[in-house]
Amino acid sequence: MASTFFGLDIAYTGVQAANAKLNTTANNIANVDTKGYTRQEATQVASDALRISQSYGMAGTGVTVTDINQVRNEFYDVKYWQAQTNLGQYDMKMYYMYQIEDYFTDKDTVEGFEPIFSAMFDSLEEVYKQAGTPSTKTQFIGAAGDLCEYFNAQATNLEKLQLGVNEEIKNKVDEINSIAEQIATLNKQINTIEVNHLRANELRDKRNLLIDQLSKIVDVEVRETPIYTTPGGTEKSGIYTYEVSIAGGQILVQGYEYNTLECVARSAEEKVNQSDADGLFEIKWSNTMDFNLYGANLGGELKGLIEVRDGNNEEYFHGTTKSVKPNSDGTYEVTIEVPNKDYLTDMNKCTLPDSGQLTLVNTKYKYSGFEFDGTKIPATYTFKIEREAGQADPTIFDGKEARVGTKVDYQGIPYYQEQMNEWVRIFAKAMNDIEKTAVDEEGKPAEVLFTAKEKVSGDEIKFTADLADNKYKSSDSDYYRLTAGNISVNNEMVKDASKFGTTVDIKKGGDAQDVTELLLTVQDDKNKVNFRGCSAKEFLQCITSDIALSANNAKTFTENYTNINKSVSQTRLSISGVDNDEEALHLVKFQEAYNLSAKVMQIMTEIYDRLILQTGV
């Protein structure tokens, strides 16, 4: 049988439910501008009915508020994270490609390639007109030095930019580690509360906001799995395992545990590309597991930074091991056949450092030099490698894949470094080959006009090696050792311009200019300098077209993903965000419900007053 005060109890549950909804609405309104806040709503259900001794059998007992839940759609969360990942990647590319474009753009305030190159050949034209005049030779040598300084400066700019990107990569790794730690801590706090079958909404908001931040840095996958009270059971314990994966499924956070990444600087012997800056970071898991830095599934700002720093347009050293021979000193000679691709068979395009790491399948061995043999197809490279303690015997990799570095399908800093190196090698060789046919004013054979300076010793490399047989050693004095960063004018000519020869025969007189005439043709003659089908003076057009294309692509994708991001974000906010107008309607609605339940209580009170006070019950 129902209590005498049954109706009053029912009205009280209505007041409680309306009050809970009013408080939830008030909380939503208070957090309308809180970043990451998810709109909440109180869930109410009818209370369990009560059996009574009446013909209708059971009577309702009012209402119960079961939960205060977040209004959230996981589908749009995933879409938002994907949009953030893509936006982060192209935003980084656009930012740095505009910087590279700025380096190569001729400005009114700073002379670029075209005016410097033109000035050099203008001064050479003056030598042609007045071959016996010392001042014209001095002016030409100075103009040639200006061209060298231009490339030196560009190489330095790209190296500094590469180091800047490298530092930004470290910052992003630190951010990932910090976010991982915070998520693991929040997982524990959330489970501590929710094991009592409560809902830690605010803590969940903090965690979701961290995932939002992480998704822009790197691609992210989230999985939340309930834990049941018994294995194979159906009753949930209230605890969940929250797992976060990045970079194509690599575990970052698993429940209360998290993994961290660390940046390990490459040593000078571990360079991947010849012109790479020293100390570029490899990223590894702190538990010694490899982090798949170049995986196709990597995304976000980290991917954009990696592609800018390491992008080689897929032009990297790779081939198949032909033979592995042990030496008496404990080293090994590994001969590798390479595909018939010009960036592997033309030493002007090759980017191998003198020493570095050769990867046989998945094992890295240090090499201290290499030899190239291009006399037959396929061309071969022979490396001298060292086997460290614990490493596999290299002979087991006979016939297996070999590589230095890895392919990165983007025209990043290494690509533009290689393009400059290739041009200065072709151009310097063309000029030097002509100049070496001349004699100076004393009748002595002229030396090369352009040289390379050793980075450490500062010694000049004058390219004395003979590559007529298309063979090369990394220790040879050849144009492969010439880069945009070390090209210079022969110091002997800088000191004494008379060392610059203008004729093949001094007997022709001081005004003889047959060599000068040939040198002048280098700027236009594609038979002497052919850079990607262009003449020497068209170098900048080739480079800037690449940069402009990459920069415009990055800009277009950034704009597209910005629009997608905004669209998904708006849809997401329409579901989980707080709308002032909607909450204002809820206030009126729940106030009315509260008033009605209160009115019921008032009426029931009057009934009980009459029943108790006036009937003498």
Q: Which residues make up each language-model segment?
A:
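Structural signature of extracellular appendage/secretion-system components
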Residues: 1-617
